[in-house]
Amino acid sequence: MLRRLITPLRWTDFITPSTLQLAPLVELLLEPMETAANLAELQLGLQEALVNAVRHGNGGDPGKCLRIRRILTPHWVIWQIQDEGCGVPVCARSNELPERSDACCGRGFFLIHHCFDDVRWSERGNRLQLAAQRHRV
């Protein structure tokens, strides 16, 4: 007999003003991963993604908000970070390290891609989805 296992997704939504005081938010977002062997790596990647959303997406405007959804599944923890900006162009979403060490942009995306198991962008480019496998926890 074939049984279908239904495992509900659990998610939490966070809405916060654009600010660079992100340490408490990062800590809260990482609560389900507090025993992860790669916690420092995830913390670094989330911090970078949030700073990019505040600085570049929302232009540092404290009147704009970030929307973050944390999704827990049996095998993954997923963070979706959305800003109010016009989005990152497809051509700028590289996971490669910039050729020039003094390049003004691109290092953050390289770092983010190396901190998470899966990185995806919305079509518009103003929502970034980051995922970490739970078996690494």
Map each language-model feature to its residues:
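A generic structural signal for beta-strand entry/edge sites
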Residues: 74-78, 125-127
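Conserved ATP-binding N-box helix of the HATPase_c
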Residues: 37-62
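Short beta-strand/loop element within the Bergerat-fold HATPase_c
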Residues: 65-75
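Flexible, glycine-/charge-rich segments associated with ATP-binding catalytic modules
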Residues: 1-17, 113-137
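Solvent-exposed beta-strand sheet faces enriched in polar/charged residues
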Residues: 69-71, 82, 122, 131
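Glycine-rich/acidic phosphate-handling loop/turn and adjacent ATP-lid/helix
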Residues: 78-105
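Glycine-rich phosphate-binding loop
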Residues: 101-116
